[in-house]
Amino acid sequence: MNWLNSNHQILFYILLITALLLTRIPVLGKYFRSVNTLVHEAGHAFVTLLLSGEVIAVNLFADTSGTTVTKAKGKFSQALIALAGYPVSALTGWLCLFLLYKGYNLYILFILTSIALIIMILSLRNMYGLFWAGTFVVLNLLLIYFNHKIFIYAFAAFYSVIIFTDAIISSVVLFVLSVKQPKKAGDATNLHKVTKIPAIIWAILLLAFTLFISWLSVIHYFPSIKTLI
């Protein structure tokens, strides 16, 4: 534990670089990047429930894409549900980095494991999604059970930086899609269908929000580079 306290800044940046590299590796990288997909789709699902709508199905796919099929009355509710995914991912990344900064590493595992369990039990419908959520939950429960401080910190930081980086990357991808293929720009297209506001406008707003939250995360919760010099 003393080693972790004195070296967590270095370990954080090692994990940040590892996450950026590892998540680009086929299969294994996509497996870990699915944690951000889980959070994104959970955002749609939870907002649906908050608005008294119905979550019909959540699907997670091996290519890190996902879908959430919902029922909701009124265009305002439908717009809020379509809007939820990217902001929830960005805010979850912020929350995880805040908890990491405060030393509440176990809380990160508890939160992500709880989200996976709830979605798996109530809404997941496809085989890959069930496989991924099941193995993700088992991995985290083993980490929690053995409670090895360095491994707890390593995985908590790893998940945090994956959600943080993938929230940014996916928002950039959404913006590019809204420019090149506005009819296939995911949530931005869905928002256009409900509000008639062009998909690119929604993509810009979502990207701006994600970058703002990410900037707050960096300036407040990233370990100071000066401590490494």
What are these regions (language model features)?
Residues 4-8, 12-14, 58, 67-222:
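Metalloprotease/metallohydrolase-associated module, dominated by Zn2+-dependent proteases
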